[in-house]
């Protein structure tokens, strides 16, 4: 049992899992959530989303060149 806790490989895997969740998974879920609910969010939901954006800002910055939250428009003009 002690060899499990002293194993540097398990520690490395744990760090990779935590960092990938923080920088990749949750920011993509936030982008998806904001893109689908931007115009129909309530004030408390928006406040919570702003808090999550503040918390996961580094991951959102990584994806910002590739994703955007622009409105689709009506197609006229």
From Swiss-Prot:
It catalyses: a plastoquinone + NADH + (n+1) H(+)(in) = a plastoquinol + NAD(+) + n H(+)(out); a plastoquinone + NADPH + (n+1) H(+)(in) = a plastoquinol + NADP(+) + n H(+)(out). The chain crosses the membrane at residues 12-32, 47-67. It holds the Pfam family NdhL. Keywords: Membrane, NAD, NADP, Plastoquinone, Quinone, Thylakoid, Translocase, Transmembrane, Transmembrane helix, Transport. GO terms for cellular component: plasma membrane-derived thylakoid membrane. One of its GO terms (molecular function) is quinone binding. Its EC number is 7.1.1.-. It is a multi-pass membrane protein. It is found in: Cellular thylakoid membrane. The keyword Transport applies. Belongs to the complex I NdhL subunit family. NDH-1 can be composed of about 15 different subunits; different subcomplexes with different compositions have been identified which probably have different functions. NDH-1 shuttles electrons from an unknown electron donor, via FMN and iron-sulfur (Fe-S) centers, to quinones in the respiratory and/or the photosynthetic chain. The immediate electron acceptor for the enzyme in this species is believed to be plastoquinone. Couples the redox reaction to proton translocation, and thus conserves the redox energy in a proton gradient. Cyanobacterial NDH-1 also plays a role in inorganic carbon-concentration. This is NAD(P)H-quinone oxidoreductase subunit L. It comes from Prochlorococcus marinus (strain MIT 9301). The lineage of its organism: Bacteria, Bacillati, Cyanobacteriota, Cyanophyceae, Synechococcales. The gene is ndhL.
């Amino acid at each position: 049992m002690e060899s499990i806790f002293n194993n540097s490989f398990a520690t490395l895997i744990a760090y990779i899992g935590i960092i990938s969740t923080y920088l990749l998974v949750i920011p993509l879920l936030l982008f998806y959530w904001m893109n689908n609910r931007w115009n129909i969010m309530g004030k408390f939901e928006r406040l919570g989303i702003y808090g999550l954006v503040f918390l996961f800002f580094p991951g959102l910055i990584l994806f910002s060149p590739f994703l955007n939250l622009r409105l689709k428009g009506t197609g006229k003009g």
